[in-house]
């Protein structure tokens, strides 16, 4: 009885919150993906798998395969992955640079990093049109990539910076005393200590980049539509909520699989470093 009370007191509120605002909405969306769009544009019975067939490119009778959605999904994955990679290349050294500064300068740099959050997201993305148009880069996939990198770079830098501040630099000195080169000492002693922040930064960057539709809609145009644009269009202009729900679950599945693979690889890497 005491254990039940302790559970209700500690985990009960969080469990109720997650159930009401995460599990239940996802369940509703999944049920919508199995329903039929009516003649008046509503969602109703009977249950059907037609929406899922359309998601994977098949018609109702599995006679024709048109992988347009899968091509858009693949484009979304590699664009989001490339944007995340750019955030890693730019943000990882930046986090170390900020951590190496004096306290006063560090606060100033962190403030400059956070200031864009105080400006409306749409205004910041529209500003890139003014920057890129004179160079003939708007609209284009490159413009979308630059916009994503700009938008999500702070989400990568902040968790990595938090990990860098906790690095024990005595391990680097010990590695160098044992004959390791500076590069080898950094890779063996510093990178594993910043791995939690690196994983968190990649997740916080890749997930919103994969599902975004604002950046690609403004900077990319119709030729660079991503899966987020497809979902937004189904729930908006097209009004096909059943099909949009199926697309949403496909996007969710890809995100979860990607996060699982990355976490598994990062965890395996951490175990190898400890060994």
Q: Whereabouts are the PLM-identified features?
A:
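Membrane-interfacial helix termini and adjacent extracytoplasmic/periplasmic loops
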Residues: 49, 122-149, 183, 219-223
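C-terminal transmembrane helix and the adjacent membrane-cytosol boundary/short C-terminal tail
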Residues: 2, 9, 161-176, 188, ...
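Transmembrane alpha-helix signature in integral membrane proteins
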Residues: 64-97
């Amino acid at each position: 009885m005491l254990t039940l009370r302790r559970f209700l007191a500690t985990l009960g509120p969080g469990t109720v919150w997650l159930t009401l605002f995460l599990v239940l909405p996802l369940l509703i969306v999944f049920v919508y993906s199995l329903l039929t769009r009516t003649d008046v544009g509503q969602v109703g019975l009977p249950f059907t798998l037609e929406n899922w067939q359309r998601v994977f490119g098949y018609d109702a009778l599995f006679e024709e395969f048109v992988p347009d959605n899968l091509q858009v999904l693949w484009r979304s994955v590699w664009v989001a992955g490339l944007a995340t990679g750019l955030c890693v290349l730019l943000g990882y050294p930046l986090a170390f640079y900020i951590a190496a500064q004096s306290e006063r300068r560090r606060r100033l740099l962190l403030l400059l990093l956070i200031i864009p959050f105080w400006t409306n997201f749409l205004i910041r993305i529209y500003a890139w049109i003014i920057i890129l148009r004179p160079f003939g880069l708007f609209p284009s996939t490159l413009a979308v990539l630059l916009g994503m990198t700009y938008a999500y770079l702070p989400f990568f830098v902040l968790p990595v910076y938090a990990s860098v501040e906790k690095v024990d630099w005595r391990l680097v000195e010990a590695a160098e005393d044992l004959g390791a080169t500076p590069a080898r000492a950094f890779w063996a002693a510093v990178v594993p200590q910043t791995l939690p922040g690196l994983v968190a930064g990649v997740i916080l960057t890749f997930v919103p980049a994969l599902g975004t539709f604002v950046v690609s809609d403004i900077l990319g145009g119709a030729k660079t539509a991503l899966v987020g644009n497809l979902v937004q269009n189904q729930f908006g202009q097209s009004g096909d909520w059943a099909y949009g729900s199926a697309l949403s679950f496909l996007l969710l599945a890809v995100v979860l699989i990607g996060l699982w693979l990355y976490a598994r690889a990062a965890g395996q890497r951490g175990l190898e470093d400890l060994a």
